[in-house]
UniProtKB/Swiss-Prot annotation:
Cystine connections: 237-239, 270-273
Protein name: 33 kDa chaperonin
Pfam families named in the record: HSP33 (PF01430)
Organism superkingdom: Bacteria
A GO biological process held by the record: protein refolding
Primary location class: cytoplasm
Function per UniProt: Redox regulated molecular chaperone. Protects both thermally unfolding and oxidatively damaged proteins from irreversible aggregation. Plays an important role in the bacterial defense system toward oxidative stress.
Post-translational modification: Under oxidizing conditions two disulfide bonds are formed involving the reactive cysteines. Under reducing conditions zinc is bound to the reactive cysteines and the protein is inactive.
């Protein structure tokens, strides 16, 4: 079963819901960035939340999430879009601690609680939509929940989880977002709250083989969920050799000549996917000609 998410309504439209399986997507974190387990869990939770929040967008709209809690992990940055594509990185990938008192990876200690959670949505308008809230727990699920309630005024529950194997690969990852629509009945809220208190962690549900549809049934009850859309989820980076070449051209002919004289080659790495692009002296000379032509 590949990674995917489902968008759904429940309780006759009173609840908007999304659930995702992101095991392979999150698995790109240790593969691309050599993240240690606690860092993998933190970045994986952010990637999972980003994929689900991106799925709430439309068309070519995009979302950037910046998590900076002042902890040893540094900054987590995640980009996502409406197509189920997500990418991300963490400033300090080599962070790992002993399990916390609950027997889980200590994401809160890695992320920290002295900072902000920032969301930037590019909706294709003149200005970006920006929302920012203080980080209240560092576990991220609670922090995303607080963002929805505080910045978007939507009562929500967000759960994200990652299980890491002893060899640092990803065993299971996934998440859910539940949102109450205006006018939701009290009995519906009570039922959901009771279920949230009794269900296993979402990462354990994914590990046991539950699909996103089945996770929503665990959360909301069988027969209450109406799936609206299914969307593949994947780690996809928008970087390319052409984009890096354009960036070099934008430096100008003189700057490119300086690189040729001093280094004889150019090398650039993408923060998001860790892909490295190499340009030989001959290729740089061609880019210099293009920069000259552009200036003319």
């Amino acid at each position: 079963m590949g990674d995917y998410l489902v968008k759904a309504l429940a309780y006759d439209g009173q609840v908007r819901a999304c659930a995702a399986r992101t095991t392979e997507t999150v698995g790109e974190a240790p593969r691309r960035h050599q993240t240690w387990p606690t860092a993998s869990a933190a970045l994986g939770r952010a990637l999972t939340a980003g994929s689900m929040m991106g799925a709430m967008l439309k068309g070519d709209e995009t979302l950037t999430i910046k998590i900076d809690g002042g902890g040893p992990i540094g900054t987590i940055l995640v980009d996502s879009n409406a197509k189920g594509e997500v990418r991300g990185y963490v400033t300090n990938p080599h962070v790992h601690f002993e399990l916390n008192e609950h027997g889980k990876l200590d994401v809160a200690r890695a992320v920290g609680k002295n900072g902000m959670l920032t969301f930037v949505k590019d909706l294709g308008l003149r200005d970006f939509f920006t929302g920012q809230v203080p980080i209240i727990s560092g576990e991220l699920g609670e922090d995303f929940t607080y963002y929805f309630a505080s910045s978007e005024q939507v009562p929500s529950s967000v759960g994200v989880g990652v299980l890491v194997n002893p060899d640092h690969t990803i065993l299971a990852a996934g998440g859910f977002i539940l949102q109450l629509m205006p006018g939701t009945e009290e009995k519906t809220i009570d039922q959901i709250e009771r279920r949230l208190q009794t269900i296993p962690p979402v990462s354990r549900m994914v590990e046991s083989g539950l699909t996103p549809e089945e996770i929503l049934e665990e959360l909301l009850g069988k027969g209450n969920v109406k799936v609206l859309e299914t969307l593949p989820v994947a780690f996809v980076c928008r970087c390319s050799r052409e984009r890096i070449a354009d960036a070099l051209i934008s430096l100008g002919a003189q700057e490119i000549q300086d690189i040729i004289d001093k280094e004889g080659y150019a090398e650039a790495s993408c923060h998001f996917c860790n892909e490295t692009y190499h340009f030989t002296k001959e290729e740089l000379k061609q880019l210099k000609q293009l920069a000259d032509a552009k200036k003319a």
